């Protein structure tokens, strides 16, 4: 089962669109679920995601026009409970102790957060944490040179194989990270 994880698009305020090389990779009919950390900013960005997969889950980012998106969401995909937050509620941004507390409060196997616009994936106390970064490479308050990235999770039984796609220069680099639920 393929799950696209992305966020912090900031279209059209900070970027015009997804990188063309990412659009070529993201084709309709291949992905079953989309988990978005927010800051899509417009309905057009949401409509684009709906063309890629029928099952789209979004949480509200601090720049989203749609105030109906929830602050947090728990989604079950296969054997995994996945928590989804934007990340602006994590202080300081990306703080491990704050993320671990949210993971415990949501009682999830995987916690997905954004806001920092920098990709990160790691295991901590037998739980898995993913920050897909910014799919467009949109800048944030602390950093101008953001590497565009998104994540594709392949969920099979008690294993998640995470593929991170990063646009470095003109090349899309792919890294593979595996997490087994214990």
UniProtKB/Swiss-Prot annotation:
GO molecular function per UniProt: metal ion binding
Organism: Xenopus laevis
Subcellular location as annotated: Cytoplasm; Membrane; Endosome membrane
Family membership: Belongs to the VPS29 family.
Topology of the protein relative to the lipid bilayer: Peripheral membrane protein
Membrane-spanning intervals of the chain: none
Protein name: Vacuolar protein sorting-associated protein 29
Function recorded in the entry: Component of the commander complex that is essential for endosomal recycling of transmembrane cargos; the commander complex is composed of the CCC subcomplex and the retriever subcomplex. Component of the retriever complex, which is a heterotrimeric complex related to retromer cargo-selective complex (CSC) and essential for retromer-independent retrieval and recycling of numerous cargos. Component of the retromer cargo-selective complex (CSC).
GO CC list: cytosol; endosome; endosome membrane; retromer complex
Keyword tags: Cytoplasm, Endosome, Membrane, Metal-binding, Protein transport, Transport, Zinc
Keyword Zinc: yes
GO biological process entries: endocytic recycling; intracellular protein transport; retrograde transport, endosome to Golgi
Quaternary organization: Component of the commander complex consisting of the CCC subcomplex and the retriever subcomplex. Component of the heterotrimeric retriever complex formed by vps26c, vps29 and vps35l; within the complex interacts with vps35l. Component of the heterotrimeric retromer cargo-selective complex (CSC), also described as vacuolar protein sorting subcomplex (VPS), formed by vps26 (vps26a or vps26b), vps29 and vps35. The CSC has a highly elongated structure with vps26 and vps29 binding independently at opposite distal ends of vps35 as central platform.
Domain of life per record: Eukaryota
Cross-referenced SUPFAM superfamilies: Metallo-dependent phosphatases
Main location: cytoplasm
Cytoplasm among keywords: yes
């Amino acid at each position: 089962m393929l799950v696209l994880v992305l966020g912090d698009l900031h279209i059209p305020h900070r970027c015009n669109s997804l990188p063309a090389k990412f659009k070529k990779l993201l084709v309709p009919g291949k992905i079953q679920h989309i988990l978005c950390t927010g800051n899509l900013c417009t309905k057009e960005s949401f409509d684009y995601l709906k063309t890629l997969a029928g099952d789209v889950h979004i949480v509200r980012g601090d720049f989203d026009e749609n105030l109906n998106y929830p602050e947090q969401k728990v989604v079950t995909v296969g054997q995994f409970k996945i928590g989804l937050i934007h990340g602006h509620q994590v202080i300081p941004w990306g703080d491990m102790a704050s993320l671990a507390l949210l993971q415990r409060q949501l009682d999830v196997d995987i916690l997905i957060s954004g806001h920092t616009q920098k990709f990160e994936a790691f295991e901590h106390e037998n739980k898995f944490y993913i920050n897909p970064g910014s799919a467009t490479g949109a800048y944030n308050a602390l950093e101008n040179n953001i590497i565009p990235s998104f994540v594709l999770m392949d969920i099979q039984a008690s294993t998640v194989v995470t593929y991170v796609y990063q646009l470095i220069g003109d090349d899309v680099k792919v890294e593979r990270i595996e997490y087994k639920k214990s």
